[in-house]
Amino acid sequence: MSKYTVLVVGMGKRGMHHATTFNANPKFKVTGICDIDAARLDAAAAKLGNPQKGADAAGLAKALKPDVFCFCTLPNLRLPMIRAALEAGAKLIAFEKPVALTSAEVFALRDPIRQAGAKAVVSHQHRYGKHYQKVKEIIASGALGRVHTVYGSATGWMTHMLSHLIDYTCWFNNYAPGVWAMAQAAGKS
């Protein structure tokens, strides 16, 4: 069985975690890594079996033509990373939340991915926490009856924590369509 080839861009803590996890799965092989910090890139390469490496994500992607393009970068780099992935022919693009910084950017990302026939996966790792899985199990068992109202709150950077709240609220309820929603924000604009 041939393995899916993976390029991971951004070798900080999260990128290193993704690369290590891909390599631990027998279906994947990290064939390239990318970071603009040369020392961090060298350290990551040594830990990952010395895959090809570089500081130019688009150039490395074009050279490697990975099946999977995974990036763990700042949110303002979403569109250039997705373009690089698609131009290299990647069929799966994996990245961290938030999906985008504006609703217009969501569509600017979504449309070229769809047109290329690729798939995108946004990491919501809270689903793998035992306490979140237990809540999902309890709700699915019917022990609480029909869920008809969900309340939630988040603090801190809205695109960081609120996206988790929205994700697992939808997940807990099998993506039942929302009927009504209300949101409020306070503080500096």
Positions of predicted regions on the chain:
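Short histidine/acidic/glycine/proline-rich micro-motifs that form metal-
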Residues: 99-100, 126, 154-159
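Rossmann-fold dehydrogenase core element
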Residues: 108-126, 145-150
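Rossmann-like dinucleotide-binding domain that binds NAD(P)(H)
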Residues: 147-189
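N-terminal Rossmann-like dinucleotide-binding module
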Residues: 1-48
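Rossmann-like NAD(P)H-binding beta-loop-alpha module
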Residues: 130-149
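Nucleotide donor/acceptor-binding cores
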Residues: 2-4, 91, 118, 147-148
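Beta-loop-alpha module in the N-terminal Rossmann-like domain of NAD(P)-dependent dehydrogenases
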Residues: 18, 48-112
